[in-house]
Every structure is written in structure tokens, then in C-alpha cells.
Amino acid sequence: NEEKIKPLMIPVMTDSFDAVVISDYNKGYLTTEKIFEIVESASCPVFIDSKKSILPNKPNCFIKINDVEYEKLDDYNIDNLIVTKGSEGCVYKQTLYPSEKVNVYDVVGAGDTFLAALVYGYITTNNIDESLMMGNRAAAIAVQQLGTYILTEEDVQKILY
């Protein structure tokens, strides 16, 4: 007997955060309504990596998806949509931000690494263009390793301008 998965009840309290990051793998813990509630109440930027097909379109919200997830979206009219394109880099507002060409050993965790560097870049520079390139550089470092890779301090120095 499997227990029915219940949606995660998260109190919305984002006032003291520099950013909110939502990684939602659409397993039923985080409802679409809760994501919208978090975005609506946030006084800081919200970064979402989600498998859901309905996503918020708000000025303070950045949505990161990959090519496959892009094809499944219900609404393509999202202002701050970031589409990761593997070795090509990412697209934001119809502009390609190219990635450095590297030898790829393992892509596991590359999207999470991209998102972490993107968020770090944005909260430290408030510049989305620089942040996207930081995300690309971080993911390029991660895919050169076997398995899930956590950036070192030396790696972080490499991704900074």
C-alpha cells in the first residue's frame, strides 16, 4: 500500500531572503497554486526550475527550463523565460548566450549547477546577462566531471567576471 502523496504545505515568508529558488520535479509535493502563491508574495527574485506546464509570468520571476520542457509548455508568453540548450548555452528573450565548448563527460546535475550559479550571479550583480554567462560557465565546469559535481571555491572564481 502506497500512501497518497500530499502537497507540501510551505508557509510563505520570503521577506528576509535575497532570492527564492524552487526546483520542482512535479512529484506532487508542490502544487501549481503554491508556486503562484510564493511568486505573488515574494519581495525578492524567484527562480523556478519546474516540470510543470503552467508557470507564473511575473517581473520578479525567472523560469529555467530545458528544450524538452519548453515543448510541453502551455503558455510560451513568459517574459523571464530561460531555456537551457545543453552545449549550445541558453536562450533568454530570444538571445542566445553561448556556452564554452568543453569535453562533456557527464551531464548529471548540469541544470542544477547552472541554476545555482545563475541565482548567485543575479543576487550579487543584479545583472541577468552576466548571471546567464556565469550559469553557462558553471555548467561547463560541471559536465567535465563524472557524476554530480559540486563547484569548488576555485571553480567559483573561474565563473566570476
What are these regions (language model features)?
Residues 1-17:
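Conserved phosphate-binding/catalytic loop of the ribokinase/pfkB sugar-kinase fold
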Residues 13-19, 33-59, 72-161:
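Conserved phosphate-binding/catalytic region of the ribokinase-like
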Residues 17-29:
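Short acidic, glycine-rich surface-loop motifs adjacent to enzyme active sites
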Residues 61-67:
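A short beta-strand/loop micro-motif in the catalytic core of glycosyltransferases
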